[in-house]
């Protein structure tokens, strides 16, 4: 159509020129008609190019809408989920005991060692027995954990949880210990929270011994009273391993403890 329009336009101009203008004028009009023709052709070529690009864009867009993103695809810096299944937290295993439940580090093993009165559960780190979890259940005449007083007062009544001093004798003050003392305990934090209508005590304690090679032990204690029983969960790790990542396992285990 572009060339046909150009031919008709050029013929009309030429015949009009032949009747009214000299030869030189005819050449000028023909030249203009050629430019018009060229412009029309270029315009149609541009339209054709735009149409092809538009069609390609629509095709790509339709393909994107019609396809599903593969679960294995991952953004830069992220690991691909090759099998396309939702990721689960495999660091902990849920444990349900008689009247309580707790999240136990998955790489810790059950232990038969009995260290505390009323102990019903014990798990230890596969590579370091200093990192462990214990649950104790003992009878009590208290109706609530708050009947023991403040968290600090409660701890003084169950101080056996922190371990006993094995050596008794005269010693000089050394390494921050008092005279004749080879062990110390510092309460780092206490907290009281209501869970399911029951108050819970949370305590963070750092214990140290003169011969300890771990720089001390971080001990987290969770306690509550339910149905005439005192429930205590104690999780701990050595100070050195605490700052190398063991803290997240101990903290999760202690704070996950709850009674039915």
From Swiss-Prot:
**Could you list the residue ranges forming a coiled coil in this record?**
none
Using the UniProt record, give the first listed, main subcellular location. plastid
Where is this gene product found?
Plastid, Chloroplast thylakoid membrane
- Origin: domain of life: Eukaryota
Q: Which Pfam families match?
A: PsbP
Q: Where is the transit peptide?
A: 1-74
> Which Gene Ontology cellular component annotation is one that this UniProt entry carries?
extrinsic component of membrane
Question: Under the GO molecular function aspect, what terms does this record hold?
Answer: calcium ion binding
Key words, A-Z: Chloroplast, Membrane, Phosphoprotein, Photosynthesis, Photosystem II, Plastid, Thylakoid, Transit peptide
* Gene Ontology biological-process annotations: photosynthesis
| Reported induction | By light.
**What family does the Swiss-Prot or TrEMBL record give for this protein?**
Belongs to the PsbP family.
**What is this protein for, i.e. what is its function?**
May be involved in the regulation of photosystem II.
* Name this polypeptide is given: Oxygen-evolving enhancer protein 2, chloroplastic
């Amino acid at each position: 159509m572009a060339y046909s329009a150009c031919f008709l336009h050029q013929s009309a101009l030429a015949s009009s020129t032949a009747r009214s203008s000299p030869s030189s004028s005819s050449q000028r009009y023909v030249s203009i008609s050629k430019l018009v023709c060229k412009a029309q052709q270029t315009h149609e070529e541009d339209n054709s190019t735009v149409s092809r690009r538009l069609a390609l864009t629509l095709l790509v867009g339709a393909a994107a809408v019609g396809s599903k993103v593969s679960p294995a695809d991952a953004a830069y810096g992220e690991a691909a989920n090759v099998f396309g299944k939702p990721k689960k937290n495999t660091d902990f295993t849920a444990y349900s005991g008689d009247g309580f439940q707790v999240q136990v580090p998955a790489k810790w093993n059950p232990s038969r060692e009995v260290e505390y009165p009323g102990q019903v559960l014990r798990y230890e780190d596969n590579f370091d027995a200093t990192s462990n979890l214990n649950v104790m259940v003992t009878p009590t005449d208290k109706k609530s954990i708050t009947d023991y007083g403040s968290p600090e007062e409660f701890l003084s009544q169950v101080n056996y949880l922190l371990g006993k001093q094995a050596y008794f004798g005269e010693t000089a003050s050394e390494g921050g210990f008092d005279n004749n003392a080879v062990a110390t305990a510092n309460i780092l934090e206490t907290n009281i929270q209501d869970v399911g209508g029951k108050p819970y005590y949370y305590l963070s304690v750092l214990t140290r011994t003169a011969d300890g090679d771990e720089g001390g032990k971080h001990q987290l204690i969770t306690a509550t009273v339910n149905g005439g029983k005192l429930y205590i969960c104690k999780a701990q790790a050595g100070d050195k391993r605490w700052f190398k990542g063991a803290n997240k396992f101990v903290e999760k285990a202690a704070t996950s403890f709850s009674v039915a």
